[in-house]
Amino acid sequence: MVIHAIVPVKELHRAKQRLARVLDAHERRALSLAMLNDVLVALSYSPVSRIIVIGRDVETGHTARAHGAAFVIDQSAALNDALHQAAADIPDHAAALVAPSDLPLLGAEDVIALTCISGDKPGVAIAPAHDGGTNLLLVSPVVGWTFLFGPDSLTHHIAAARQRHLPVHLLRLPHLERDIDDIDDLIWLAQQPGDTSAQRLARMFLERKGAQLWQSSDMPPH
C-alpha cells in the first residue's frame, strides 16, 4: 500500500484558543509548532511514502520542509476543504493517512499498527478520539472519499465507509485518544512518559505557571 500522509495545521494565530487563559499568543504558537514537529518526526520514521502539510503560515512551511514534507498553502481555512485540497494531489490508487498536527505522542509504531490492521486491501482504519472524534484516519483508496471531520466524526466516517462498502477497522490507542486543546490536556501531556518537543514545552509551562495552570484545571493537583 502506498500511503500519503496529510497533516492539516490551523493558522497559528488561531490555534489553541482554549489555552489563552494561561498561555499567551507566542506560547501557543510555539506549542503548535512543537506538536507539528513531533508529528512530522513520527511520520518520517513510518511507512508513509510522502508527507503533505497543509496550512497558511510561513513557520508551518519552514517546519514542514525541514522534515522533507511538501507544504501546500490552504486555500479554504476549513478543515475538510483543506483535506480535500491536499488529497487532490494524491494518486487515485494510493491511500491517505490524515494525522492532525496536535498529536504530540504519535509514534511511527502507531502508523505501522494502523496499516497492519487495514492490510493491503481497500478499507478504512481509524484511531478514535475520546470524545467521539477521529484522531487518525487511513483511507484506501482515497479517490472519491469525503472527509467528515468535526463533531461525532467517528460515526460519520464509519457511515461513509459502509456507504462505499469498505471494511472499517478501529484501533484504540489511549495515548492518541485526546488531542491537546485545553488546560487539562496540557497537564496530561506534561505528565505522560516520553520526551517529545511538545512535552518539554508543556513541562516548562507547568514549571513556570504551575499554580495558574492547576487553578484553571479540572484535574486534581499532583
Curated annotation (Swiss-Prot):
Per its record, the protein catalyses: phosphoenolpyruvate + GTP + H(+) = enolpyruvoyl-2-diphospho-5'-guanosine + diphosphate
Annotated SUPFAM superfamilies = Nucleotide-diphospho-sugar transferases
Give GO terms for biological process: F420-0 metabolic process
Q: Which residues bind phosphoenolpyruvate?
A: T134, G150, S153
Q: Which UniProt keywords apply?
A: GTP-binding, Nucleotide-binding, Nucleotidyltransferase, Transferase
Q: Other notes on this protein?
A: The exact nature of the substrate is currently not known. This entry has been annotated based on its similarity to Actinobacteria.
Return the protein name. Answer: Phosphoenolpyruvate guanylyltransferase
Organism whose genome encodes this protein: Roseiflexus sp. (strain RS-1)
The major lineage groups are:
Bacteria, Bacillati, Chloroflexota, Chloroflexia, Chloroflexales
